[in-house]
């Protein structure tokens, strides 16, 4: 039986030389009469003279294949972690003007010609009109922001003003509509409550414009919501959280979460899930959960644990960890917008595809686009994970519109694909209030309207044929209906006319109430 040696360093069982080797007369004689080198393994073959000369090796066999190149590239990226977001091409795209091209080293004549062109451009009546229109639009936007700078609940004023406005498509901040009166607050609350109960009981909810959702949180009050949810959370149990490896831990009671928080196992950015939650969410994004867990003694224990960890790593205690710097909402929004622009510049510089083979580990988190987690996750200090291309394709089929970096971990992705062949909630992307849902809702409403309309018409025709004098009664009902509609239209026109007069005169309901009170006082004095 033959055996082969795959060891590149001579024989498997070669005896190591002694410290002082003795004189070998056989090898000395062989040095004067050299012989052919015998192989280091037993072989059964033909004699020497029957062996063919070895074929020359081609130069192309040393080149790795495409899969080996991908594997080598992936291993190199895991070891070096290249930063594709800060390259000269990306910085150039961010710094250059999106409209005008900057010419390098222009001559004096070109500079003067450009200045003359700009002067003639600004002197154009059309350009001046458009410039004035933009100034008026800016002033109107500023007035609308000032008109909505105070929420309905006075205790939420600081929180309301600390949150920055979202920039709109035209670059101007979009104002958040503040609730002005108690009637409007009640309408918001009950409008939300009716649709909420419909969804709670399994019925379809009425669609609302995505740009103007029902702001029931402002009507109730943000601080009141914190307190109400705090009372509810203190009475409930059964929480699951994601550890630093992405595994689900639970169920846990509040006291268990407090212990984990004090020991540094979880923090305010840890993803958590409760029995009545639709998705995993960070602890600080769940109403009332962070105050229930991070009480003063728990925060004191967590600070002591963090202090010890900093001392072990040689970090000064007063220096915050990377990504944990205290920042305002405005700073977080600015960093998130700049990060998004840089990501888009990376895609533009690489033909619409993110470069490299390895998916960054911070990009595997579901809420990676959240401004509160951007600085933490972009540091890429978490365990390296890799989603193969085949799994990405399966995820794209199962979850429409899903991107690879919107998955918490491989474990969650496989759970979503093979959760016993069933979903424990509606598949992502199926329930929306966008245009398709609104079109379907309108079709259903029109179908019901046609059914009841045709039914009422046919019932009326049947009664007219069978009941004598029914047509006379219907004529009288129709005349009364027309008179009632005419009275309502006239009353509504008067109300609109009064509202226009109040708007142009600058009068408010409070002024009218004060005048009515003064009239009542004067009448009482006369009496």
From Swiss-Prot:
Modified residues (Deamidated asparagine): 350
UniProt-recorded Gene Ontology molecular function terms: protein transmembrane transporter activity
Subcellular location: Plastid, Chloroplast inner membrane
Subunit (UniProt): Part of the Tic complex. Component of the 1-MD complex, composed of TIC20-I, TIC214, TIC100 and TIC56. Interacts with the translocating preproteins. Hydrolysis of ATP is essential for the formation of this complex. The 1-MD complex interacts with TIC21.
Keyword flag Plastid: yes
Source species of the chain: Arabidopsis thaliana
Superkingdom in the source lineage: Eukaryota
Extent of Acidic residues compositional bias: 509-521
Keyword annotations from UniProtKB, A to Z: Chloroplast, Membrane, Plastid, Plastid inner membrane, Protein transport, Transit peptide, Transport
Effect of inactivating the gene: Severe defects during embryogenesis, producing abnormal embryos and thereby leading to a lethality of young seedlings.
Keyword Chaperone: no
Region of interest called Disordered, as start-end residue ranges on this chain: 43-67, 491-527
GO biological process, one term: protein import into chloroplast stroma
Name this polypeptide is given: Protein TIC 56, chloroplastic
Reported function: Involved in protein precursor import into chloroplasts. May be part of an intermediate translocation complex acting as a protein-conducting channel at the inner envelope.
Chief localization: plastid
GO cellular component labels: chloroplast; chloroplast envelope; chloroplast inner membrane; plasma membrane; plastid
Segments of skewed composition (Basic and acidic residues): 491-508
Residues of the transit peptide: 1-48
Stored InterPro entries: GYF_2, TIC56
């Amino acid at each position: 039986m033959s055996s082969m040696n795959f060891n590149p360093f001579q024989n498997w069982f070669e005896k190591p030389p002694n410290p002082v080797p003795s004189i070998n007369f056989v090898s000395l004689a062989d040095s004067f009469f050299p012989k052919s080198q015998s192989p280091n393994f037993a072989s059964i073959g033909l004699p020497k003279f029957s062996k063919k000369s070895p074929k020359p090796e081609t130069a192309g066999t040393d080149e790795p294949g495409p899969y080996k190149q991908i594997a080598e590239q992936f291993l190199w990226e895991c070891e070096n972690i290249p930063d594709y977001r800060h390259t000269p091409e990306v910085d150039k795209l961010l710094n250059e003007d999106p409209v005008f091209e900057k010419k390098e080293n222009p001559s004096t004549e070109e500079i003067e010609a450009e200045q003359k062109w700009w002067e003639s451009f600004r002197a154009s009546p059309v350009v001046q009109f458009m410039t004035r229109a933009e100034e008026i639009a800016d002033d109107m936007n500023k007035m609308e922001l000032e008109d909505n700078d105070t929420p309905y609940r006075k205790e939420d004023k600081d929180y309301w003003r600390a949150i920055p406005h979202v920039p709109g498509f035209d670059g101007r901040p979009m104002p958040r509509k503040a609730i002005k009166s108690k009637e409007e607050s009640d309408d918001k609350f009950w409008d939300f409550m009716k649709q909420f109960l419909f969804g709670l009981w399994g019925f379809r909810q009425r669609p609302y414009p995505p740009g103007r959702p029902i702001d029931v949180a402002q009507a109730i009050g943000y601080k009141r919501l914190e307190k109400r949810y705090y009372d509810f959370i203190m009475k409930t149990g059964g929480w699951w959280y994601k550890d630093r490896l992405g595994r689900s831990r639970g169920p846990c009671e509040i006291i268990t979460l407090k212990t984990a928080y004090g020991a540094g196992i979880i923090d305010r950015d840890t993803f958590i899930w409760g029995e009545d939650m639709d998705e995993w969410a960070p602890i600080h994004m769940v109403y009332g959960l962070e105050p229930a867990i991070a009480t003063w003694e728990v925060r004191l224990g967590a600070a002591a644990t963090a202090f010890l960890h900093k001392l072990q790593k040689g970090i000064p205690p007063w220096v915050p960890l990377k990504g944990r710097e205290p920042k305002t909402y405005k700073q977080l929004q600015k960093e998130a917008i700049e990060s998004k622009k840089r990501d888009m510049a990376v895609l533009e510089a690489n033909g619409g595809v993110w470069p490299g083979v390895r998916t960054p580990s911070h990009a595997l988190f579901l809420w990676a686009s959240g401004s509160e987690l951007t600085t933490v996750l972009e540091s890429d200090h978490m365990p390296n994970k890799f989603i193969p291309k085949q799994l990405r394709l399966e995820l794209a089929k199962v979850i429409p519109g899903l991107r690879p970096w919107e998955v918490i971990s491989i474990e969650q992705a496989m759970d979503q694909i093979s959760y016993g062949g069933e979903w424990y909630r509606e598949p992502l992307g199926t329930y929306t209030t966008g245009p398709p849902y609104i079109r379907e809702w309108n079709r259903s409403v029109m179908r019901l309207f046609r059914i009841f309309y045709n039914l009422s018409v046919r019932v009326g025709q049947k009664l007219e044929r069978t009941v004598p004098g029914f047509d006379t009664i219907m004529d009288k009902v129709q005349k009364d209906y027309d008179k009632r509609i005419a009275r309502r239209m006239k009353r509504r026109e008067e109300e609109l006319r009064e509202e226009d007069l109040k708007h142009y005169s600058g009068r408010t309901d409070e002024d009218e109430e004060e005048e009515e009170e003064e009239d009542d006082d004067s009448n009482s004095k006369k009496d």
